[in-house]
Amino acid sequence: KKICDIDLSQFNNQNNRYTTLKRTKLIEFLLKNIPSEKIVFNSDLIDIKNQNKLSLCFRDKKNEEFDYLVAADGIYSKTKQILFKGEGLPKYFNSIALRGNIQNFKDFDISLYLGPNFHFVIYPINQNKEFNFISIIRKELIQEEISNRNLFKENNFINNLLNQISSKSNLNLTEKVQKITCFPIFVSKRIQI
């Protein structure tokens, strides 16, 4: 059931403008505007030490010190594996995320839908009537399924999840959502470094 529409413009003022955008556009913007000497690609982190600052050790024997570390290297994060080695790896949260695109959705506000064991959000990403679709679905999986990264790329698996949501909402998402990606959701304990 749709629970609300959010018009972001109501939060705008002279100094702050709120918007939504496609993740790829954000990455393009960041790569264009962050000096290239500040970005290091294809580095292999092997250890993290905490003295007065965070010291990151890389496979090429290079060490760098930082005040902060943001671990944003994905679901199967090498950084998280290093950080959580004493705490155990993040655990599957019995939930799966779906992400996709919708063309020409009827409502230009952010739309939030809640249902039994799922929710989804549809929001505009540009002025060309392109929208992002994001959903979280409760789904128990056995360890073998969780470990099978190919499962989350299988069309049958993804279509079954979309059908679950579509059958409990007033939208036929299986026909509307395109370029769907699917991934398991993991949770981690909060740790102090």
What are these regions (language model features)?
Residues 1-84, 88-101, 142-144, 151-155:
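Conserved N-terminal helical subregion
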Residues 44, 50, 103, 118, ...:
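Residues that form or immediately flank small-molecule/cofactor binding pockets and catalytic motifs
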Residues 93, 102-106, 185-186:
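Short amphipathic alpha-helical patches
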Residues 4-18, 22-28, 59, 63-64, ...:
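Conserved FAD/dinucleotide-binding core of flavoprotein oxidoreductases
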Residues 182-193:
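FAD-binding beta-loop-beta segment adjacent to the flavin cofactor pocket
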